[in-house]
């Protein structure tokens, strides 16, 4: 909750009768700013001897939900449409039939304006039930048939949209949890979804905002995954224009609009076109100034922070990193634990990579400790594998090679169903070569081996998934040539 919502909740509580112990609990939770329930309970028992925290928490939970639901009605279009439906039902039960149908018609216009197919179908069904209860007075057979035809058309459209969304969800799931050796293999495994999506588009008679939005999201996600970043950027820019043309259809918070911005940034970042990313990062910064929910604003802050930091890191501009870090300390970094687990894991990885790149090995290893000490909560996430590899790299850089071979064998065994990428296999081989040889002949031999491997991997677009977080190939080059990792990153940026 933001400050205005907290203030509004306390005003709402003032309208309630009885003893308000739950407000004391609310203040304790707000002031302590901790997720440790024991600390909260101890403070509550100190300030309210003999009072039950369970009862206070239960009542606080109930009041918070009631308050937030009321606030949601003020912002949510769907809640406003539901309100019109309830008004219509009340009027109809009060035998004010004409007024009831008028209120329902207002809700219907709102649903049509915002292209909410579910609400449109619900309103049509309620309208049919009301007309049936009235014996279809004043409604001709032709008008009745027309109304039913509209309802059937809406049901067909809704079914098409749901089929389209299901394809997009399956695509995203495959991209998250399936791994392929080559672009050709990936294209082959995704071809069924691509053909199904094209079939839906070609056989749909309705072309509107929702259908176009889902089509562009699907195509863009596919293009990013197969390495066609130019087409992905083009589609995402088209999607952003579509949102601007239909601004009233953007959700509050604008989740799909945010996805489009992130899609452009991800495509440009993967293609290493860093110069054009500044404009879209600026859009994220502008979104932070709007009055959206706290969770949404926290996610937007994270995205602005993440892409800004990654650009600085990947281009070797490390002297600006601390300044950016300080600017996000209050609005984001103190609240990392409030973000989803995948973002928390991404934060730990980003922080460790920066420390590792700067040579602060002990700090980098310490930064990853929460990940490994949290049990299995992070282990199911795809990024956990990369963190294990980075941790191994930190260990050998610190001069410790105990159990490294055992850990590498365990890592390969754990991911037998998820093929390691070429980059991951190469960096694991490189880790096993520690300590690196000092004699010139062996140095030349090992350098030639890795140089040839690096040339092959750089041509493979599929490897950008791993390299976008940390340029392992440039790191290997820095260790073999003696040139600092930071300088090689800077030189690479100048060559782009």
Task: Kindly give the residue locations of the regions a language model identified.
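Active-site/pore-lining binding-face segments in mid-to-C-terminal subdomains
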Residues: 373-441
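Flexible inter-repeat linkers and adjacent short helices
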Residues: 1-192, 204-206, 413, 429-430, ...
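Helix-turn-helix repeat elements of alpha-solenoid scaffolds
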Residues: 58-62, 95-105, 136-148, 180-199, ...
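Alpha-solenoid helical repeat architecture
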Residues: 115-122, 158-165, 203-213, 247-259, ...
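Alpha-helical linker/edge segments of TPR/alpha-solenoid repeat scaffolds
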Residues: 128-144, 150-158, 168-176, 263-273, ...
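"A position-specific structural signal for the A-helix of alpha-solenoid helical repeats
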Residues: 82, 86-90, 119-122, 126, ...
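Amphipathic alpha-helical segments of tetratricopeptide repeats
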Residues: 105-113, 146-156, 192-204, 237-249, ...
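Alpha-solenoid helical-repeat scaffolds
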Residues: 138-142, 159-276
């Amino acid at each position: 909750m933001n400050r205005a919502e907290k203030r509004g909740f306390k005003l709402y509580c003032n309208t309630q009768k009885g003893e308000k112990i739950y407000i004391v609990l609310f203040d304790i939770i707000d002031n302590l700013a901790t997720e440790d329930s024991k600390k909260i309970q101890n403070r509550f028992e100190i300030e309210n001897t003999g009072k039950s925290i369970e009862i206070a928490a239960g009542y606080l939970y109930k009041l918070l939900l009631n308050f937030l639901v009321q606030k949601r009605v003020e912002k949510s279009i769907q809640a406003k449409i539901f309100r019109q439906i309830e008004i219509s039902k009340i009027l109809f039960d009060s035998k004010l039939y004409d007024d009831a149908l008028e209120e329902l018609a207002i809700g219907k216009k709102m649903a049509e304006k915002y292209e909410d197919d579910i609400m449109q179908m619900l309103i049509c069904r309620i309208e049919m039930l009301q007309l049936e209860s009235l014996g279809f007075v004043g409604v001709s057979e032709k008008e009745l048939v027309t109304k039913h035809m509209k309802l059937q058309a809406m049901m067909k459209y809704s079914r098409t949209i749901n089929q389209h969304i299901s394809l997009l969800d399956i695509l995203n799931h495959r991209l998250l949890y399936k791994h392929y050796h080559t672009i050709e293999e990936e294209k082959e495994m995704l071809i069924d979804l691509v053909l199904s999506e094209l079939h839906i588009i070609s056989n749909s008679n309705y072309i509107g905002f929702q259908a176009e939005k889902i089509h562009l999201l699907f195509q863009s996600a596919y293009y990013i995954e197969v390495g066609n970043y130019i087409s992905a950027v083009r589609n995402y820019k088209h999607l952003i224009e579509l949102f601007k043309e239909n601004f009233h259809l953007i959700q509050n918070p604008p989740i799909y609009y945010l996805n489009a911005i992130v899609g452009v940034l991800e495509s440009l970042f993967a293609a290493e076109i860093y110069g054009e990313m500044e404009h879209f990062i600026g859009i994220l910064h502008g979104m932070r100034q709007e009055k959206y929910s706290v969770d949404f604003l926290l996610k937007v802050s994270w995205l602005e922070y993440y892409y800004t930091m990654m650009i600085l890191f990947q281009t070797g501009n490390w002297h600006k990193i601390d300044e950016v870090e300080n600017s996000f300390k209050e609005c984001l970094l103190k609240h990392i634990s409030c973000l989803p687990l995948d973002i928390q894991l991404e934060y730990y990885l980003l922080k460790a990579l920066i420390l590792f790149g700067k040579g602060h090995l002990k700090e980098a290893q310490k930064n990853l400790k929460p990940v490994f000490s949290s049990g299995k909560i992070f282990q199911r996430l795809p990024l956990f594998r990369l963190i294990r590899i980075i941790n191994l790299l930190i260990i050998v850089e610190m001069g410790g090679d105990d159990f490294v071979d055992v850990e590498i064998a365990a890592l390969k065994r754990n991911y037998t169903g998820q093929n390691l990428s070429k980059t991951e296999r190469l960096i694991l081989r490189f880790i096993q070569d520690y300590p690196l040889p000092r004699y010139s002949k062996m140095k030349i031999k090992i350098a030639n081996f890795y140089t040839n491997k690096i040339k092959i991997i750089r041509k493979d677009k599929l490897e950008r998934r791993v390299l976008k977080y940390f340029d392992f190939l440039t790191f290997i080059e820095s260790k073999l040539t003696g040139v600092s990792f930071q300088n090689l990153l800077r030189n690479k940026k100048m060559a782009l």
